[in-house]
């Protein structure tokens, strides 16, 4: 059985002071929760204060992006070595907002995924189709290209520590959600791709999250599906009450 995994993607919200205060409330709210892995992914400036606030808790630290090089003349970038040094465990890579607004390609995302593994970070690798692609009936073709290109050169041993987040782009921040059956269909397809890449044993260990307007009201239906192992939560991760409800609803 794969352990549920709920990760909060805070995007560009919360100052370092706000983030530390929020996390202290969240720790208290989740202190008696077990049977689920939980991570929060604050903006870069908040990583250190959040890391300090999380000490001794049952919540892991994640980042929202990284460069693939250890160091260098890359103004404005943050390296995997820096994230590892802070104590980051997870890193979101390939999010649709990075692809759309910052021109990230499948090839660049692949470099980042391999670098994350090299530095002992666990990628949360995001894939998903746009509304236009869904309406054209090419969801699986789009997701297949993203998965195969994104995971090129990744070993089966590394893939054991991989999380994939299926996030239909048209559902992110819109209030629209793929139906649980639609989400399951794509997540099952992703798992079958992983079987081809790494074999059944490894594919069955990889956790596949759903992302895209996840709320306390829909988490139970989503998590009940056999190939959905958790959620990458956006807006609802910014409030203690809603994020706690999603975490508890996943168990």
From Swiss-Prot:
It is an enzyme of class 5 (isomerase). It comes from the Bacteria. GO terms for molecular function: triose-phosphate isomerase activity. It catalyses: D-glyceraldehyde 3-phosphate = dihydroxyacetone phosphate. Keywords: Cytoplasm, Gluconeogenesis, Glycolysis, Isomerase. Its main location: cytoplasm. One of its GO terms (cellular component) is cytosol. Its EC number is 5.3.1.1. GO terms for biological process: gluconeogenesis; glyceraldehyde-3-phosphate biosynthetic process; glycerol catabolic process; glycolytic process. It is found in: Cytoplasm. InterPro entries: Aldolase_TIM, TIM_sf, TrioseP_Isoase_bac/euk, Triosephosphate_isomerase, Triosephosphate_isomerase_AS. The active site is at residues 95, 167. Substrate binds at residues 9-11, 173, 213, 234-235. Pathway: Carbohydrate biosynthesis; gluconeogenesis; Carbohydrate degradation; glycolysis; D-glyceraldehyde 3-phosphate from glycerone phosphate: step 1/1. PROSITE patterns: TIM_1, TIM_2. NCBIfam families: tim. Homodimer. HAMAP family: TIM_B (MF_00147_B). Involved in the gluconeogenesis. Catalyzes stereospecifically the conversion of dihydroxyacetone phosphate (DHAP) to D-glyceraldehyde-3-phosphate (G3P). Belongs to the triosephosphate isomerase family. This is Triosephosphate isomerase. The lineage of its organism: Bacteria, Bacillati, Bacillota, Clostridia, Thermoanaerobacterales.
């Amino acid at each position: 059985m794969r352990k549920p995994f709920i990760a909060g993607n805070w995007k560009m919200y919360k100052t370092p002071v706000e983030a530390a205060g929020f996390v202290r409330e969240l720790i208290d709210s989740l202190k008696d929760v077990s049977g689920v892995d939980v991570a929060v992914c604050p903006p870069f400036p908040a990583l250190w204060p959040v890391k300090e606030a999380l000490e001794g808790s049952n919540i892991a630290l994640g980042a929202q992006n990284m460069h693939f090089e250890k160091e260098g003349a890359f103004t404005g970038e943050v390296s995997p070595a820096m994230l590892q040094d802070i104590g980051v465990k997870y890193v979101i890579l390939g999010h649709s907002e990075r692809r759309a607004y910052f021109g990230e390609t499948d090839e660049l995302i692949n470099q980042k995924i391999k670098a994350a593994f090299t530095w002992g970070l666990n990628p949360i690798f995001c894939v998903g189709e746009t509304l236009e692609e869904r309406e054209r009936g090419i969801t699986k073709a789009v997701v297949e290209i993203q998965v195969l290109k994104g995971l090129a050169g990744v070993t089966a041993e590394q893939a054991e520590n991989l999380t994939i987040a299926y996030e239909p782009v048209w559902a992110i921040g819109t209030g629209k959600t793929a139906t649980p059956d639609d989400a399951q269909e794509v997540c099952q397809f992703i798992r079958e791709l992983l079987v081809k890449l790494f074999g059944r044993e490894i594919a069955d260990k990889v956790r596949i999250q759903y992302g895209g307007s996840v709320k306390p009201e829909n988490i139970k239906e989503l998590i009940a599906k056999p190939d959905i192992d958790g959620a990458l939560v956006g807006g609802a991760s910014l409030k203690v009450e809603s994020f706690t409800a999603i975490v508890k609803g996943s168990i």
